[in-house]
A protein has these predicted regions:
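Expand to "…catalyze enediolate/carbanion chemistry for C-C bond making/breaking, isomerization
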Residues: 1-240
């Protein structure tokens, strides 16, 4: 958001219907002159989380939270080399629930091209650190060209295969295509339930011609749990 539009963005947030939403609001980084006004706006918004730009120092986050008497959940944006180097420490912070990758700022700071294939090792480490510290699977970086929905879908498939739980989006037109990749379908849900039921009722080691072992069974159970959770939240339409 440009400097001239920041106050309008805060006013729009106050008017946004937040009922039924697990909402996180991106705020300016802790060194920014705008973060105080961002926080003042959030204080009027009820139980919304913070997506913290350029998250770098867990100790600075603690001091900032204590100074402003804030107890909100935080989603860290990994956008700098320093922040990436502190990923493990950030993921251990009690207020932090997960992270997301901002590849444009990160590549600028690192001095490389903003090519997600070149940044694959850093993306993989965010997935690893999130899992290691029991946090939510991270959100992958944006697809900047909003006219290229097919590319967005390819990027979502790639992110999902790498272990990301979702993707940062920059335009409403990207929401449904991304959901179609990351959210379990009704067919996937029913097939997972059938697999779990069959393996529970008999000593089956094959399902639809495929060998079933513990990792495959666990993935099916995770899909069922995710689908049920999303349906209960009523935020997403998982009945595609």
């Amino acid at each position: 958001v440009s400097q001239s539009q920041k106050q309008l963005a805060r006013e729009n947030l106050l008017e946004f219907d937040k009922q039924g939403c697990n909402l996180f609001v991106r705020v300016n980084d802790l060194d920014s002159a705008f973060v105080r006004d961002d926080l003042a706006c959030l204080e009027k918004c009820g139980e919304v989380g913070i997506m913290l730009s350029k998250s770098e120092d867990p100790h600075a986050i603690t001091q900032w939270l204590e100074q402003h008497s804030v107890t909100r959940q935080i989603l860290c944006l990994s956008e700098t080399v320093m922040g990436f180097a502190h990923t493990s420490a950030l993921m251990q912070h009690e207020n932090v629930i997960g992270c997301a990758f901002g590849h444009f700022d990160f590549s600028t700071d690192l001095g490389c091209e903003a090519d997600i294939s070149l940044l694959a090792p850093y993306r993989a480490d965010l997935v690893l650190q999130s899992k290691l510290h029991g946090k939510a699977a991270p959100l992958d970086c944006v697809t900047a060209d909003i006219s290229q929905i097919d590319q967005l879908k390819l990027d979502c498939v790639d992110a999902k295969r790498r272990g990301f739980g979702g993707k940062l989006l920059i335009h409403p037109s990207q929401v449904k295509p991304a959901q179609s990749i990351f959210l379990p379908s009704k067919d996937d849900y029913e097939k997972a339930k059938e697999l779990v039921a069959v393996t529970a009722s008999q000593a089956v080691i094959q399902f639809e011609g495929r060998m079933i072992d513990k990792p495959i069974l666990k993935k099916a159970e995770q899909l069922i749990e995710k689908y049920d959770r999303l349906m209960e939240s009523k935020v997403f339409d998982a009945h595609r």
